[in-house]
């Protein structure tokens, strides 16, 4: 049996122990701020590497996308809607975000599917009045009629086409507004209720929802519009009207009334 060196039992090792450095010592934290049409504005904090040389920390934050429950943003009990927010501008230590998408949770979608019913899905690309191009997906299920004794409630092919056409028509009509107003329609689910009401004459539907919203294209970035969206129109603050001394300018001190 050949006897060799056991490296694990060797007393001496080349070099010392590697110094463990906590990576978070090189990071700083920023507040993530939601638009003003949500009840809860401060939604969390996010870390980013500190500014080093020509690499700014703000550049690492712009474009980040955060996904959170709509229930956390609006203090609502309906927890099956998820909202995506994208960072568009940095102001101090705050990340100003804008709407980037919406979807239903997987468990909610799975719970909707049942036997003996037809699934109706439709999608359409729309353009809002302020230049956002959105792709909207809707979903619905046929409902058993009140005077029917049949076990199933399947819709015929012609009825399915008519239902999809009506869905597309309503989604296009509801999107003829700006993005802020459209998001306010998404949150309570009024578009799904409108589809369910208008499709009643074709075939009764139930469990109608806007399943997903994607932002395909955004208009040219405008800081003033983003500040207005966050309730800070034009960047006006409470310090408006104060006389601010320029750097290097002499300011005469006020006389002291007492020593």
UniProtKB/Swiss-Prot annotation:
The keyword Cytoplasm applies. GO terms for cellular component: cytosol; cytosolic small ribosomal subunit. Its main location: cytoplasm. The keyword Ribosomal protein applies. It comes from the Eukaryota. It is found in: Cytoplasm. SMART domains: Ribosomal_S3Ae. GO terms for biological process: translation. GO terms for molecular function: structural constituent of ribosome. Keywords: Cytoplasm, Ribonucleoprotein, Ribosomal protein. InterPro entries: Ribosomal_eS1, Ribosomal_eS1_CS, Ribosomal_eS1_euk. Belongs to the eukaryotic ribosomal protein eS1 family. Component of the small ribosomal subunit. Mature ribosomes consist of a small (40S) and a large (60S) subunit. The 40S subunit contains about 33 different proteins and 1 molecule of RNA (18S). The 60S subunit contains about 49 different proteins and 3 molecules of RNA (25S, 5.8S and 5S). This is Small ribosomal subunit protein eS1.
